[in-house]
Protein backbone atom coordinates (compact mmCIF):
# COMPACT_ATOMS: atom_id res chain seq x y z
CA UNK A 1 0.00 0.00 0.00
CA UNK A 2 2.76 2.45 0.95
CA UNK A 3 4.67 1.77 -2.28
CA UNK A 4 1.50 2.35 -4.32
CA UNK A 5 0.84 5.67 -2.57
CA UNK A 6 4.33 6.98 -3.32
CA UNK A 7 4.42 5.88 -6.96
CA UNK A 8 4.35 8.95 -9.22
CA UNK A 9 3.03 7.25 -12.37
CA UNK A 10 -0.42 6.33 -10.99
CA UNK A 11 -3.55 8.11 -12.17
CA UNK A 12 -4.58 10.55 -9.45
CA UNK A 13 -8.35 10.42 -10.03
CA UNK A 14 -8.49 6.61 -10.02
CA UNK A 15 -6.53 6.41 -6.77
CA UNK A 16 -8.75 8.96 -5.06
CA UNK A 17 -11.90 7.11 -6.08
CA UNK A 18 -10.52 3.84 -4.72
CA UNK A 19 -9.57 5.41 -1.39
CA UNK A 20 -12.97 7.01 -0.92
CA UNK A 21 -14.79 3.72 -1.54
CA UNK A 22 -12.58 1.91 0.97
CA UNK A 23 -13.02 4.49 3.73
CA UNK A 24 -16.80 4.60 3.26
CA UNK A 25 -17.01 0.81 3.54
CA UNK A 26 -15.04 0.81 6.79
CA UNK A 27 -17.10 3.58 8.43
CA UNK A 28 -20.44 2.06 7.38
CA UNK A 29 -19.41 -1.33 8.74
CA UNK A 30 -18.48 0.11 12.14
CA UNK A 31 -21.76 2.02 12.41
CA UNK A 32 -23.82 -1.04 11.42
CA UNK A 33 -22.12 -3.23 14.02
CA UNK A 34 -22.73 -0.70 16.81
CA UNK A 35 -26.41 -0.39 15.94
CA UNK A 36 -26.87 -4.14 15.97
CA UNK A 37 -25.24 -4.60 19.35
CA UNK A 38 -27.73 -2.14 20.85
CA UNK A 39 -30.71 -3.84 19.17
CA UNK A 40 -29.66 -7.33 20.33
CA UNK A 41 -30.15 -6.37 23.98
CA UNK A 42 -33.67 -5.05 23.35
CA UNK A 43 -35.73 -6.62 20.57
CA UNK A 44 -33.76 -9.85 20.07
CA UNK A 45 -33.65 -10.97 23.69
CA UNK A 46 -35.98 -13.94 23.14
CA UNK A 47 -34.22 -14.95 19.94
CA UNK A 48 -31.89 -17.88 20.62
CA UNK A 49 -28.36 -17.13 19.45
CA UNK A 50 -27.76 -20.74 18.41
CA UNK A 51 -30.76 -20.80 16.07
CA UNK A 52 -29.73 -17.54 14.40
CA UNK A 53 -26.66 -19.13 12.85
CA UNK A 54 -23.55 -17.01 12.46
CA UNK A 55 -22.80 -18.59 9.08
CA UNK A 56 -26.06 -17.38 7.55
CA UNK A 57 -25.66 -13.92 9.07
CA UNK A 58 -22.11 -13.47 7.78
CA UNK A 59 -23.08 -14.59 4.28
CA UNK A 60 -25.91 -12.06 4.08
CA UNK A 61 -23.68 -9.29 5.37
CA UNK A 62 -20.97 -10.09 2.81
CA UNK A 63 -23.45 -9.87 -0.06
CA UNK A 64 -24.83 -6.54 1.14
CA UNK A 65 -21.52 -4.68 1.40
Swiss-Prot record:
**Tissues where the protein occurs:** Testis.
Give the matching InterPro entries: Protamine_P1
Keyword field contains Nucleus? yes
Q: Name one GO molecular function term.
A: DNA binding
Q: Which GO terms describe its biological process?
A: chromosome condensation; sperm DNA condensation
This protein's GO CC annotations: nucleosome; nucleus
Region Disordered: list its residue ranges: 1-65
Q: Where in the cell is it found?
A: Nucleus; Chromosome
Q: Tell me where on the tree of life, at the top rank, the source sits.
A: Eukaryota
* Keyword terms of this UniProt record: Chromosome, Developmental protein, Differentiation, DNA condensation, DNA-binding, Nucleosome core, Nucleus, Spermatogenesis
Instruction: Say what the protein does.
Output: Protamines substitute for histones in the chromatin of sperm during the haploid phase of spermatogenesis. They compact sperm DNA into a highly condensed, stable and inactive complex.
Q: Which family does it belong to?
A: Belongs to the protamine P1 family.
What protein name applies here? Answer: Sperm protamine P1
